């Protein structure tokens, strides 16, 4: 996985890679909650929580 991308699983179980700078995934049944696995070089960081928490985690990874 290239730096700056995150991987998430949608409601159908399909895994989707998206640019972490641009896109986040909001769970259909819990719109206030976001679940991402963020890949940065050789490690992955799973982030689950409020949208603010996820955005903060992604921002901190790049700053």
Task: List the model feature ranges, each with a label.
Residues 1-17, 21-63:
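Acidic, Ser/Thr- and proline-rich intrinsically disordered linker/docking segments
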